[in-house]
Amino acid sequence: MWSLTANEDESTTAHFFLGAGDEGLGTCGIGMRTEESDSELLEDEEDEVPPEPQIIVGICAMTKKSKSKPMTQILERLCRFDYLTVVILGEDVILNEPVENWPSCHCLISFHSKGFPLDKAVAYSKLRNPFLINDLAMQYYIQDRREVYRILQEEGIDLPRYAVLNRDPACPEECSLIEGEDQVEVNGAVFPKPFVEKPVSAEDHNVYIYYPSSAGGGSQRLFRKIGSRSSVYSPESSVRKTGSYIYEEFMPTDGTDVKVYTVGPDYAHAEARKSPALDGKVERDSEGKEVRYPVMLTAMEKLVARKVCVAFKQTVCGFDLLRANGHSFVCDVNGFSFVKNSMKYYDDCAKILGNTIMRELAPQFQIPWSIPTEAEDIPIVPTTSGTMMELRCVIAIIRHGDRTPKQKMKMEVTHPRFFALFEKHGGYKTGKLKLKRPEQLQEVLDITRLLLAELEKEPEAEIEEKTGKLEQLKSVLEMYGHFSGINRKVQLTYYPHGVKASNEGQDLQREPLAPSLLLVLKWGGELTPDGRVQAEELGRAFRCMYPGGQGDYAGFPGCGLLRLHSTFRHDLKIYASDEGRVQMTAAAFAKGLLALEGELTPILVQMVKSANMNGLLDSDSDSLSSCQHRVKARLHHILQQDAPFGPEDYDQLAPTGSTSLLNSMSVIQNPVKVCDQVFALIENLTHQIRERMQDPSSVDLQLYHSETLELMLQRWSKLERDFRQKSGRYDISKIPDIYDCVKYDVQHNGSLGLQGTAELLRLSKALADVVIPQEYGISREEKVEIAVGFCLPLLRKILLDLQRTHEDESVNKLHPLYSRGVLSPGRHVRTRLYFTSESHVHSLLSVFRYGGLLDETQDAQWQRALAYLSAISELNYMTQIVIMLYEDNTRDPLSEERFHVELHFSPGVKGVEEGSAPAGCGFRPASSENEEMKTDPGSIENLCPGKASDEPDRALQTSPQPVEGTGLPRRSPLIRNRKAGSMEVLSETSSSRPGGYRLFSSSRPPTEMKQSGLGSQCTGLFSTTVLGGSSSAPNLQDYARTHGKKLPPASLKHRDELLFVPAVKRFSVSFAKHPTNGFEGCSMVPTIYPLETLHNALSLRQVSEFLTKVCQRHTDAHAQASAALFDSMHNHQASDSPFSPPRTLHSPPLQLRHRSEKPPWYSSGPSSTVSSAGPSSPTTVDGNSHFGFSDQSSVNIHMTEEKQGFGLLQETPGDGTRELHIERQQELVEPAQSPQELPVEICPSGSQGVTKVSQTCQEVPDIVQPCHNIHEEIGQPQQEVPDISQLLLKDHDTTTNTCHLCQASQLSQKVCEEICQLCQDNHEESNQLCQEVSVKLGRMVHGFPVNVDSTAQETLMEIGRPTQEIPEDPYQEFSVKVGVLAQKAPAISELSQDIPEADKPSQELSEETELQAQEVSEEIDQESEVVDELPPEAIS
């Protein structure tokens, strides 16, 4: 009746067809037409185009809902499917017409809201039998909170403890209420205040929260938002006496609620908002909308989203989550609900709904439609070596962004009040104390004021200098009129025999004194607005490292990552040290990377993990190692000589022959003379500032970042005082501060026009280029020793990250065709970002340069890379070291070529002097595009800047365009003007992308270009010295794609001209004057150097063995015992077998699901077959049922990541490394508990399918890996589960692999029993699994502890015992969650790899439990990685 009779061009305008009785409504909204206007249009076109079948999608809801903005936006997009026609039933029709008169439709989207006749909708669905998006009968249940809670409970979904009070005369036994002063007893269940009282009707939003008298009593009354209020406080403390209610525990959520919106079981969007219970004030933005911000769901929460969607049979469903005490609880299910104001969500939702409808209904109409198989579904990309590989892991270590100058003051304090403060905050436990919180700084300020008051009364000559410092301490702490822990920090270090010679002017050693404290005050160093822009833009550029973004979503840079991320196939963790500038840099980067909006604070809270309590990214620069003291003394001695540098000095100061160092020394010539010049220039500068302050016109002058001339003068005056000591000698340690300050003023305060700053910058930079890198060691050996002292924990964590990726995903995978078709969530990318300070970046680079990664005499590529690094004079803000791990599934699983590692580097922000960095090696695909590259696949171009452009037969030297890569997102006209459902779009965009960033030479056939370049282009992130970007980081730059498409291969010359930009601007993050730049307001923000490839032909084995060797070599005798656990594990990992996937378990061929009678919520495939709708979890096709279960390691990986990444990282604090003082540290070295011993005892009991394992440690991984094979069969979809296993796996290499075999023996039986019990329908398969995976593998599975409480907890605790840095709490939470997961063991049944039936109903169980498995892993990952529960003493 309502079908289209012509094939209209619907790509530009969405068509809405309105049912009778709503003509007046048909004219509103973009693209909406009345029935009459459409009829005329159809008549006009009827003769031109033969009729095509149409699927009619009916919208049956109240007008307020069907015409809402979200619905309109989604329906507009839905109409872009060629064969879908939308019909909106008018409210008059719904309310007044009998259902027989309602328009017929093939698919019905109908949902209840106030006043909606649900009965009529149910009758209509029975009459017409349309395909229902949201089940109608279940909507009756959603209106009753009692039924909602009952269903949630049946599904095993966590919800707060509750009791129902039914005031029903027919059921007096359910109406027992005893109210006390601070508690209420409902039907025998006692609820102490605070508790929540909810009406049983879901339509009644008058929810009350009752507070205990100790907190003041009263209640908070929540209601539907009225204006700017959502609740009000009432002094009434008595519960309501009429009506039926649900009483439940109040969950402490830290003031935020999470609202989750599902679109099918495999997609969920989550937003956090201020809890209405907090103060009742609705936070609104400038447009009057409630402030919400997107959040990441944990794996367990993703599982909950799926289960809610399936249990209530609502494809589109919203529900509320409470995050409390490390758990997530569902407290409300709202039914049909859309996200407001999220274009991304509208795109995704329409695509998922459209694909769901097409999948179910298209076959009936013989409509040609198939599941789009896009390259984005698997992160396969061309690497820089030209081969097609799957991106598995990205590890980046990034320095913070542009900051204000750091300032520091040291003073010795001996007053008892300081000692009392030191003791109060636990300083004696570690000998050090950091005070950052406002209340702590207030205590310091109070003591300072008190001492100054005493000094005024009793001045003593001998402490005059201290008086000045106390005054400065007071003035700094009083700055801004309030405390912000990010801006200032006080450190106290205990010296039992008095502080040694101070760095602030005293050259002679003092005699040993009574105990004293060294107080170090640090201020400044805040991230500037420019620093935020740099970080956010770099985050945007980093998106382009990730694959995908084809088809309808190729409209803006980096959307492949966003799709990967929103569909839960991106395992992202961001770590930052505890410095405010570092944390804010990480938050700004995350904002750009994930296209988040709003302020940085909520992003920081939600996304950035603080790694400060374990030394992972922090370093105590005030406690130098003996090696650093020696180096510093030697450096100061050489630079105090008033004579030109001679050959001896060059030998002493630059034994490594660093090009940049030699250049700087040639500029300096005589260090003392240069210091004299620098001092004179500083004096001149302070004189100019004082003069400027006398100028009346400069009284209210505001400098950059709200600095005043007075503060600027203080900054320079302090440097002037400190640089030249009383003895006339210069304090070389102040040179970096001088360079820091002058660089800041030249860049940000250039408008002042101060004289001499350019010369001061030139000279101080030359000095700093000697002092800064040489403070980290002069000889190669010193550099490595100091470097490992700084970043040993980080090295261990990087090693862990690489091996975890390798271990949990290295088994044989599904054929890419199947995986693409089902959007396998196992195809995920693991990203670990570490934001830190200059010391860690210098140190890590030193390890790679001087640690012996490769022999430069044997490797020409590495030799040129070292030459490039040698020419780098400064590791500026936003310096990046990036490690990318690829897997080549075409290689033999045991081959070393299976895993491919690339090492990239960028020196960060460009200096004030353009071109101050050398021409890099380029982000080079050493692909086989010509014979020369074939013969030397590992080579890189010379450092000669002109070489690339002189070789036209190589990939073109194209430079990124700022507008598309790092500017604001733009949609591609090619894509957006076509229908989203059109397969032609997919093929066209695929073939039109000539290799993305790789603009190939004309000799390359277009077909080959298509195969090699799965991504499109992004600007700036990758060096164009050799070619215009990374093919291992396909980007999404429309410019290259759309223009490139129009140019035939023969016109590459013109394309080269079209895309070429001068090299100096190739990462134009903020060249505001560039006409194409998207960031117009940041003209002062320097651009960032692109990534250069240091090496693109490393194997995982090489890198892992190198990192292991470095960590072992620098482990001192004291830490040897505890390090044995870690190191032995890595020795195992370095053996032949572990670095390639082990023996594989063959899984039956997968079958794509045929159209089924099942509703969409039972769909085993993903809701959307396009990247945007990728599964949130392991829900692939029914083929999932072929997956076998994994060994315990899969569960424990995440534990281990933390334990090793955080706990064991601290094991070896020798040779300058920082020792983490944690209680129970001794337990680390107790040999009795070391899993190292376990392999010998337990290996013989390895699982079936694994070759009999000998007692050699090397065999252990073989157990793991077959387990992984089994695991991966289910574990692939559970990409997160492997994380957990590796986490514990890394800690106790054998604990997971063998400990489980041993310790979990008693659990094995239970595994089988509960599996069988909980999976009655799959009883046979459950037993089959237990037999097949073997009891022993089942025991390894005990990482999903079957006993929810004690057993699981005990087992996990046993495993966790050797690394106590992480306290028990996370384990307990983990064990409960994992236990819950294990109870849902249908996963295990379905995961049995021998189950051939792919379409059985048990399929759903499989998917859910795979998800559960995944959930646990990520849950653990997140909980344990945060490590916030570390004991306070560990935090110092």
Swiss-Prot record:
Subcellular location: Cytoplasm, Cytosol; Cell membrane
One of the protein's GO biological processes: inositol metabolic process
Record flagged with keyword Kinase: yes
Single GO molecular function: inositol hexakisphosphate kinase activity
Gene Ontology CC, one term: plasma membrane
Enzyme Commission number(s) from the entry: 2.7.4.24
Protein name: Inositol hexakisphosphate and diphosphoinositol-pentakisphosphate kinase 1
Signal peptide: none
Domain notes: The C-terminal acid phosphatase-like domain binds PtdIns(3,4,5)P3 and InsP6. Despite its similarity with the phosphatase domain of histidine acid phosphatases, it has no phosphatase activity.
Family recorded in the similarity comment: Belongs to the histidine acid phosphatase family. VIP1 subfamily.
InterPro entries to which the protein is assigned, alphabetical: Acid_Pase_AS, His_Pase_clade-2, His_Pase_VIP1, His_PPase_superfam, VIP1_N
Enzyme type, top EC level: transferase
Job description of the protein: Bifunctional inositol kinase that acts in concert with the IP6K kinases IP6K1, IP6K2 and IP6K3 to synthesize the diphosphate group-containing inositol pyrophosphates diphosphoinositol pentakisphosphate, PP-InsP5, and bis-diphosphoinositol tetrakisphosphate, (PP)2-InsP4. PP-InsP5 and (PP)2-InsP4, also respectively called InsP7 and InsP8, regulate a variety of cellular processes, including apoptosis, vesicle trafficking, cytoskeletal dynamics, exocytosis, insulin signaling and neutrophil activation.
Keywords: ATP-binding, Cell membrane, Cytoplasm, Kinase, Membrane, Nucleotide-binding, Phosphoprotein, Transferase
Catalytic activity: 1D-myo-inositol hexakisphosphate + ATP = 1-diphospho-1D-myo-inositol 2,3,4,5,6-pentakisphosphate + ADP; 5-diphospho-1D-myo-inositol 1,2,3,4,6-pentakisphosphate + ATP + H(+) = 1,5-bis(diphospho)-1D-myo-inositol 2,3,4,6-tetrakisphosphate + ADP
Compositional bias per record (Acidic residues), positions renumbered to this chain: 1405-1436
Native source species: Mus musculus
Gene3D superfamilies according to UniProt: 3.40.50.11950, ATP-grasp fold, B domain (3.30.470.20), Phosphoglycerate mutase-like (3.40.50.1240)
Region named Disordered: 915-998, 1131-1191, 1389-1436
Residue ranges, annotated region (Polyphosphoinositide-binding domain): 382-453
Low complexity: compositionally biased ranges: 1163-1181
PANTHER family for the chain: DIPHOSPHOINOSITOL PENTAKISPHOSPHATE KINASE (PTHR12750), INOSITOL HEXAKISPHOSPHATE AND DIPHOSPHOINOSITOL-PENTAKISPHOSPHATE KINASE 1 (PTHR12750:SF11)
Modified residues (Phosphoserine): S939, S982, S1032, S1068, S1140, S1147
Binding residues for substrate: K64, K65, R224, K225, K259, R273, S337, F338, V339, K340
Residue positions binding ATP: 145, 198, 205, 224, 248-251, 257-259, 275, 320, 332-334
